[in-house]
């Protein structure tokens, strides 16, 4: 019998993942790479994440729409793994259009993405308040409760906005249960079912032009040879399965989540770029072994403008942690590293790197995956010489001053993954790309 020849996957999809606690600078990398890709996909999270993009003397924060929207010709997709606040989405579309960029025909939203409703936001705040000292540090945007409904099989999806009868039935069913909680447990005012039905029934005509089966769309585009860039929100150490549980987000920012959150098959993924901030930050509660509580930590916060793009909250700051990074690179299968915010370290006489932990008097090199153990470790540091000068002019590694270049190559050697991108300033052009 004659053997048949079948086409093989093109492996033209690239995944960008945060390797730390989020806020690594993924937005700049996506913005920088977007003109090299046909499609950019957001695959998980919601409006709890903020990607800051700096270009043309403007600084723009996006929470839902992929950063590629600012590159003409680039198509943007919000995947099935994202939870969407319809009000926030429409506000963001309006903001992008006011900046002079077309959105219709360039933005597609998965019909299977779940919605964040007003009662999710209230539940988020009430749940957090009830935790007392054990608060997670949620943004209060309703992300967790929306994912709870999704996995309880009670969620309302984007496609339901297009069917008024279905939407009304699901809203009534959900509010019957939620209002009991508000009334009997939290002693709060109930939501008006009729008002919510009326308000959300108006979204069908507005959102309809953007809604499609993005799983099929992406599969067909990949088979046609198109290139796809997948961007996650938050970071590996906040992943609900692989992060510092329970101080985590409610989804999977890891590279595996890129496939489930977009519908793209794994064999289309050619490379995984891990975004690494040159130091570390964390928002909210949870263990942070290399956190600094002194003037150095304050300096990192001040120079790095480390305040949440979504909440405005001050971020906790510390030195880069190679133990955590090795774990993240392994979990995500990272093939190359994008090093960001190197410029924040420009004024430090010395820079420290956490190379291992001490636990109960013993040195360990593996990242503890249970939070009680992680909270007991202390960092072991290696001190490197600072460079005390700007590298904003650099466009190649050779353009950088020797000490900054040594810092990059030290990380590369320790992590055994090539550093192919170095951000030496906030601007799109302030980039070393190897």
UniProtKB/Swiss-Prot annotation:
Entry annotation: catalytic residues: 23 (proton acceptor), 51 (proton donor)
SMART domains tied to this protein: Adenylsucc_synt (SM00788)
Listed Pfam families: Adenylsucc_synt
Binding residues for GTP: 22-28, 50-52, 315, 341-343, 423-425
Cofactor binding: number and manner: Binds 1 Mg(2+) ion per subunit.
Pathway the protein takes part in: Purine metabolism; AMP biosynthesis via de novo pathway; AMP from IMP: step 1/2
InterPro entries in UniProt: Adenylosuccin_syn_GTP-bd, Adenylosuccin_syn_Lys_AS, Adenylosuccinate_synth_dom1, Adenylosuccinate_synth_dom2, Adenylosuccinate_synth_dom3, Adenylosuccinate_synthetase, P-loop_NTPase
Keyword set, alphabetical order: Cytoplasm, GTP-binding, Ligase, Magnesium, Metal-binding, Nucleotide-binding, Purine biosynthesis
Cofactor(s) recorded in Swiss-Prot or TrEMBL: Mg(2+)
Positions bound to Mg(2+): 23, 50
Biological processes, Gene Ontology terms: 'de novo' AMP biosynthetic process; IMP metabolic process
Entry EC number(s): 6.3.4.4
Gene3D superfamilies assigned to the protein according to its UniProt record, in alphabetical order: Adenylosuccinate Synthetase, subunit A, domain 1, Adenylosuccinate Synthetase, subunit A, domain 2, Adenylosuccinate Synthetase, subunit A, domain 3
Localization terms from the record: Cytoplasm
UniProt: substrate binding residues: 309-315
Molecular function terms from GO: adenylosuccinate synthase activity; GTP binding; magnesium ion binding
Keyword Ribonucleoprotein attached: no
Signal peptide range in chain numbering: none
Reactions it catalyzes: IMP + L-aspartate + GTP = N(6)-(1,2-dicarboxyethyl)-AMP + GDP + phosphate + 2 H(+)
CC per GO annotation: cytoplasm
Enzyme's top EC category: ligase
Broad class of the protein's primary localization: cytoplasm
Record's function text: Plays an important role in the de novo pathway of purine nucleotide biosynthesis. Catalyzes the first committed step in the biosynthesis of AMP from IMP.
Quaternary structure and interacting proteins, as annotated: Homodimer.
PANTHER family assigned to the protein according to its UniProt record, in alphabetical order: ADENYLOSUCCINATE SYNTHETASE (PTHR11846:SF0)
Protein name, UniProt field: Adenylosuccinate synthetase
Name of the gene this protein is made from: purA
């Amino acid at each position: 019998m004659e053997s048949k020849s079948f086409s093989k996957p093109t492996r033209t999809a690239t995944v960008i993942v945060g390797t730390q606690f989020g806020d690594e600078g993924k937005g700049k990398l996506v913005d920088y790479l977007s003109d090299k890709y046909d499609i950019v996909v957001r695959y998980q999270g919601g409006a709890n994440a903020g990607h800051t993009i700096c270009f043309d003397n403007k600084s723009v924060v996006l929470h839902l729409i992929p950063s590629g929207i600012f590159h003409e010709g680039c198509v943007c997709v919000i995947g099935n793994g994202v939870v969407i606040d319809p009000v926030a989405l429409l506000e963001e579309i309006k903001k992008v259009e006011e900046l002079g960029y077309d959105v219709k025909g360039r933005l597609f939203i998965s019909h299977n993405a779940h919605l964040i409703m007003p009662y999710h936001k209230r539940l988020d705040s009430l749940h957090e308040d009830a935790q007392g000292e054990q608060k997670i540090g949620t943004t209060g945007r309703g992300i967790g409760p929306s994912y709870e409904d999704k996995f309880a099989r009670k969620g309302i999806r984007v496609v339901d906005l297009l069917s008024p009868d279905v939407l009304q039935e699901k809203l009534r069913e959900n509010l019957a249960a939620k209002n009991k909680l508000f009334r009997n447990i939290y002693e709060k005012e109930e939501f008006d079912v009729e008002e919510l039905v009326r308000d959300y029934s108006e979204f069908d005509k507005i959102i309809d032009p953007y809604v499609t089966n993005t799983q099929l769309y992406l599969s067909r585009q990949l088979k046609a040879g198109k290139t796809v860039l997948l961007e996650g929100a938050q970071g590996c150490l906040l992943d609900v399965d692989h992060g510092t549980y329970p101080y985590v987000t409610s989804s999977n920012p890891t590279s595996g989540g890129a496939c489930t959150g977009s519908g793209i098959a794994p064999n289309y993924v050619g490379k995984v770029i891990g975004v690494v901030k040159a130091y570390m930050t964390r928002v909210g509660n949870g263990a942070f072994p290399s956190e600094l509580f002194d003037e150095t930590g304050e300096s990192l916060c001040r120079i790095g403008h480390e305040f949440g793009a979504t909440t405005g909250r001050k971020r906790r700051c510390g030195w880069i942690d190679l133990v955590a990074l090795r774990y993240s690179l392994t979990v995500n299968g990272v093939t190359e590293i994008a090093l960001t915010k190197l410029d924040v370290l420009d004024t430090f006489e010395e820079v420290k790197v956490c190379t291992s932990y001490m636990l109960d008097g013993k040195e360990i090199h593996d990242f503890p995956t249970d939070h009680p153990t992680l909270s007991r470790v202390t960092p072991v540091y290696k001190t490197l010489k600072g460079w005390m000068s700007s590298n904003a002019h650099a466009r190649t590694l050779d353009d950088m001053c020797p000490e900054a270049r040594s810092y990059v190559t030290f990380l590369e050697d320790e992590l055994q993954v090539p550093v192919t991108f170095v951000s030496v300033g906030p601007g799109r052009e302030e980039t070393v790309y190897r």
